[in-house]
């Protein structure tokens, strides 16, 4: 089993910075939403960031080495998790930072695949091991993170039951869906599915499966696909689902969808802040870092 987790936190947070259509946020919360990376917004007890809770679950799942991919202006991460670029101790987790630099001629970062490629270039040891990858603005359960560690499949992703997601239907309908075979091996990922698509994409349990960007990768075989990832024609970014599908085409039957049926709290827009705060207060009333259980 591997013990490295790469956390994607270098994005532009464009949707979070849009004007809120809710009036239940304080001026401080609005300011943080406009200025901070999403995972650093203070939604937890004593104003601690969402990322604390993700790291807490990662520790419960027995990860040891955490690589946080930050943007070029990511100094605030170091105030929370360690001042050095690598090997900071945060409650027993070894925290290192990779920087996603913006290419010349672009204004925004070049996408999740570019972020991971820059990280493995800065930490090449990842290319000779297995590792997990996830977002910084989602709160994945310790059980889901542990499942990525424990699977024997070279590559994997958490394959969530779409109906278990506690989001508005309009939002859920925008999620890309995964097509799996009878053994839960990934065959395809479909963006913007129609109602007709949904029926033929049901898995062996009759469920519609979605990815929330929680992956396990074989660094050795993934590297070439990260390096050669094409740019998405609509979004003008290099994206991890593209890398995953290209890897599957070259290495079929090596990427399993691990079925999970649970909600994944998500900080995408200002409207999510109050809901995530309520969720954390209910399910994570106290983070006692000295007690893993």
Give the residues covered by each predicted segment.
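Phosphate- and divalent-cation-binding pockets in alpha/beta enzyme and binding domains
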Residues: 76-79, 143, 243, 275
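Structural beta-sheet core signal
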Residues: 5-7, 68, 133, 157-158, ...
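Conserved N-terminal catalytic core of the sugar/cofactor nucleotidyltransferase
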Residues: 1-7, 13-31, 44-129
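A structural signal for short hydrophobic beta-strand segments in well-ordered beta-sheet cores
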Residues: 40, 177-180, 257
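Conserved core of the sugar-phosphate nucleotidyltransferase
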Residues: 139-224
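Hydrophobic packing residues within well-ordered alpha-helices of enzyme cores
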Residues: 16, 77-81, 148, 226, ...
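Conserved alpha/beta core of the MobA/IspD/sugar-nucleotide pyrophosphorylase nucleotidyltransferase superfamily
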Residues: 5, 189-293
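Conserved beta-loop-beta/alpha segment of the NTase-like Rossmann-fold superfamily
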Residues: 92-177
